[in-house]
């Protein structure tokens, strides 16, 4: 039963990460799996589950604060291209994304669809 609960938790983490960020599902899945594994190991060794939960919540709050305080706005077309290129693993895709964002603006929407046309 614990394995099924853990699997459902990891699945939910991946889905929520994809819904919110659209990226990072692998990292979120690995972190969730490690938290579940270590949490169960600690509970089996006698740790208080509520204490573990509170500790995890405090850690999440601290990590979130640290990430937000070190975050930088991406404003220029060049910064967008560089960031998107790193995320896509392909600078030409980053350049296309920056071009599309330049055309639609900050509040615009860009829809990407798979095509059956090769090379276009």
From Swiss-Prot:
Subunit structure, as described in the record? Forms a cylinder of 14 subunits composed of two heptameric rings stacked back-to-back. Interacts with the co-chaperonin GroES.
Q: Which family does it belong to?
A: Belongs to the chaperonin (HSP60) family.
Keyword set, alphabetical order: ATP-binding, Chaperone, Cytoplasm, Isomerase, Nucleotide-binding, Stress response
**Subcellular compartments:** Cytoplasm
Question: Which protein is depicted?
Answer: Chaperonin GroEL
- Name the Gene Ontology biological process terms: protein refolding
Query: Catalytic activity annotated for this protein?
Result: ATP + H2O + a folded polypeptide = ADP + phosphate + an unfolded polypeptide
GO CC annotation terms, alphabetical: cytoplasm
Q: Which GO terms describe its molecular function?
A: ATP binding; ATP-dependent protein folding chaperone; isomerase activity
Question: Which organism encodes this protein?
Answer: Mycobacterium asiaticum
Enzyme class, top EC level, equals: isomerase
Supply the EC number(s).
5.6.1.7
Output the Pfam families linked to this UniProt entry: Cpn60_TCP1
Question: Encoded by which gene?
Answer: groEL
Residues that bind ATP: 23-27
Chain's role: Together with its co-chaperonin GroES, plays an essential role in assisting protein folding. The GroEL-GroES system forms a nano-cage that allows encapsulation of the non-native substrate proteins and provides a physical environment optimized to promote and accelerate protein folding.
Q: What PANTHER family does UniProt report for this protein, alphabetically?
A: 60 KDA HEAT SHOCK PROTEIN, MITOCHONDRIAL
Principal subcellular localization? cytoplasm
